[in-house]
Regions:
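Active-site hotspot residues in diverse enzymes, especially metal/ion-binding acidic/histidine motifs
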Residues: 2, 20-21, 29, 37, ...
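Short alpha-helical DNA-recognition segment
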Residues: 6-20
Length: 347
């Protein structure tokens, strides 16, 4: 199939259904002679390969789906958002519909790695099925809109993050950041979170190794956007360049939560994001930490060539006072740049 540029969807007319295709690819079901003849005649697949003893795999996901409760996915919400097609008996067709999404995600690795990352920043109340669905849709969207440029491992450095951070001073900086990432082969997907995902963003890897960043824009503020973006970029630069596949799924409200086990990689991503936005030597020397003023905030932002919201956000976070400097954080300024819906619909 790979040699002929075929994907599982191409087999459906000759196998009969999408679920049947996946059962055959998994080795759970054999080809009938009429199916084999049709595949050989219409798709040119050699008789030798069709008659070969089936081997389990490759499954279009890197996790086993044994025991998967397909009907527990938020199917109605997914239909409403256009992630899966509508039709009668959604629950009865749930496996077929979800395998179609997995196919579009090209077997994304996020679901299997959800368990590996569960000591990171995943909310204890999360619905794992909704979280998997969101990750698959991010990867499916990225696959459908792949940047022309190839991704070169090692391109995402602290200097690169600093370059991205300085785009924040532009009125349409978020759009420029998306363009810059795509110029380096990294898709940025803006996708509203699903109920009970408690999610801000994720750094995932596509099947070919290309990283993809997904952001929910759960909190529509300038300061939040830039920290979330740089945090996920830091995961790309520091943690996704190895040979081991991985995924990082983040509820950033859990950042530095007291008494919660912390994945050291999350602290490393925080470190890069903070350093790229406001270098530590500058932050430690400024009076803004203890005596913030509007004039001082604007002056420091101008010196660092970043948006004032970033400094306001850092002060608010460190003081745990989210009423402070609220006029500077740029509430309501991000979603509209991505043609994103307002809080009355998907957000």
């Amino acid at each position: 199939m790979k040699e002929r540029g075929l994907n599982p969807r191409d087999l459906i007319p000759y196998i009969g259904s999408q679920s049947g295709v996946y059962q055959i690819l998994l080795g759970k079901r054999g080809l009938s002679m009429p199916m084999a003849r049709a595949l050989h005649k219409h798709l040119g697949i050699s008789a030798e390969s069709l008659l070969r003893e089936p081997v389990p795999g490759p499954m279009p996901s890197n996790e086993s789906t044994d025991g998967m409760r397909w009907d527990r996915f938020p199917l109605k919400v997914m239909v409403k958002r256009g992630w899966i097609p509508d039709g009668p008996n959604l629950a009865g067709r749930s496996e077929e519909l979800l395998r179609g999404l997995i196919d579009r995600a090209q077997g994304g690795n996020a679901p299997a790695l959800y368990r590996k990352n569960d000591q990171g920043r995943i909310n204890a109340k999360v619905d794992p099925y909704a979280l998997k669905a969101w990750c698959w849709q991010v990867m499916a969207t990225a696959n459908e809109r792949l940047p022309v440029a190839n991704y070169e491992p090692g391109v995402v450095t602290l200097d690169f993050l600093n370059q991205v951070a300085q785009l924040s001073r532009l009125g349409d900086g978020p759009r420029h950041a998306k363009d810059l990432l795509e110029e380096h082969g990294i898709p940025l997907v803006i996708l509203p979170h699903l109920p009970r995902t408690y999610l801000d963003g994720a750094a995932l890897r596509l099947q070919d190794g290309r990283p993809v960043i997904g952001l929910t824009l759960r909190y529509d503020r300038i300061d939040n956007f830039w920290f979330c973006l740089l945090h996920e970029l830091a995961h790309v630069g520091r943690h996704l360049n190895g040979s081991e596949s991985d995924a990082f799924i983040d509820d950033l409200t859990l950042r530095k939560s007291d008494g919660r086990p912390e994945d050291p990689r999350e602290a490393q991503a925080d470190e890069w994001a903070e350093e790229a936005l406001i270098p530590s030597e500058v932050w430690e020397a400024t009076d803004m930490r203890n005596s913030p003023t509007a004039i001082g905030l604007l002056s420091l932002a101008n010196e660092l060539k970043i948006h004032p919201a970033i400094i306001a956000g850092r002060i608010r976070f460190e003081r745990k006072n989210y009423r402070l400097l609220s006029q500077f954080v740029g509430a309501g300024q991000i979603r509209r740049q991505f043609d994103a819906p307002n809080s009355d619909s998907k957000w």
